[in-house]
């Protein structure tokens, strides 16, 4: 009987922890934009510009193999007045 109660308790804890994680992420939407698509991406500049302008994270990505990289900025849509 004690083993069953312990199992139920652990399952209950797991369910509550999942619900708490879902509630934390609910309502947070991330947007992304390409910054200066006509110029090649410089990683340090991309990170700094994205943080200063959008309070987000910038990464250099290539749209297709062999093409120059562009700066993609991912940020919280609700945290900016854009």
Curated annotation (Swiss-Prot):
Expressed in flower buds, but not in stems, roots or rosette leaves. Its main location: secreted. Residues 1-27 form the signal peptide. Disulfide bonds join 31-77, 41-60, 46-71, 50-73. It is found in: Secreted. It holds the Pfam family SLR1-BP. Keywords: Antimicrobial, Disulfide bond, Fungicide, Plant defense, Secreted, Signal. This is Defensin-like protein 156. It comes from Arabidopsis thaliana. The gene is LCR21.
């Amino acid at each position: 009987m004690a083993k069953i109660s312990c199992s139920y308790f652990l399952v209950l804890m797991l369910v509550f922890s999942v619900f708490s994680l879902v509630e934390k992420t609910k309502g947070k939407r991330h947007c992304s934009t390409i910054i200066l698509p006509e110029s090649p991406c410089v990683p340090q500049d991309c990170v700094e510009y994205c943080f200063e302008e959008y309070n987000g994270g910038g990464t250099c990505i290539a749209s297709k193999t062999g093409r120059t990289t562009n700066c993609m900025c991912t940020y919280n849509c609700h945290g900016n007045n854009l």
